[in-house]
Amino acid sequence: MKLSKFIYLFLLVAVLVACDSGQSAQAGNSEAPRVRKTRVKKSVAKSTKVDEIIVDSTAQNSLPQGFVYVKNVIPDVIEELRYNTTNNFMGERADGYQANRAILTVEAANSLKSAADELRDKGYVIKIYDAYRPQSAVSHFVRWSLSADERNKADYYPTLSKRSLFGKYISRKSGHSRGSTIDMTICYKDSGKEVDMGGHFDFFGQASHTVFVGKYPLGEVTGEHRSMRLMLKDVMTRHGFKPIRNEWWHFTLRNEPHRNSYYNFPVK
């Protein structure tokens, strides 16, 4: 009798222990998938949120604070950004240019508007060849100047060696990247035809000097051409811009806001 009672108690304890172990194992197995599922959901949610931020940032197409599209300030401006095309001294589109949209600092754009108003009264509208220029484009110019490519030599630097352009015309930094420098000419308001200045944009040579008169490999700069260059220079100077003597098309805002800052956001 005592032996039977002992066996009965032993079997009862064994059954209880087995049941408890089974429940623990089942609980452990049900918890593991729940934890993994939660982690996966968090990871996916985080990844999706980052992608949305990137897409939204690109879609906004916004400019850094203090910069504007010139067209928004001067609606009748003609834009022909040469470095957004192959029609330039390199013969290829410059890095950083993705659209034909001139960009300037607010201060430069407002001063340019004042100049445009005076020129309009004289029968002209402004045409922009270049304005803000990304640093990536400037670096592209430097790489080009050190390469063997001379496909456009006859049209842009017929009397100069390509290597001599670096330092004199091309440098590792450009005032354009500060956002307050513009390369421009004028067109007749009624027809939109470009005024003949006696020499084209980005010609590397003496014929591009504002006061030059005489013959050069691509033609001749006459006294009338010089008068038009000087008229443009006088108007731009009156409205706060500073010219340079060797490029009749080049003007920088005297009181530019970013004298020591060079930007590298794309033109788009």
Positions of predicted regions on the chain:
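Bacterial N-terminal signal peptides that target proteins for export
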Residues: 1-7
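Bacterial N-terminal signal peptides
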Residues: 8-17
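Extracytoplasmic cell-surface/polysaccharide-interacting catalytic and binding patches
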Residues: 20-131, 139, 143-246, 255-268
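Segments that shape or occlude catalytic/ligand-binding pockets
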Residues: 134
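Conserved metal-phosphate-binding beta-hairpin within the catalytic cores
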Residues: 251
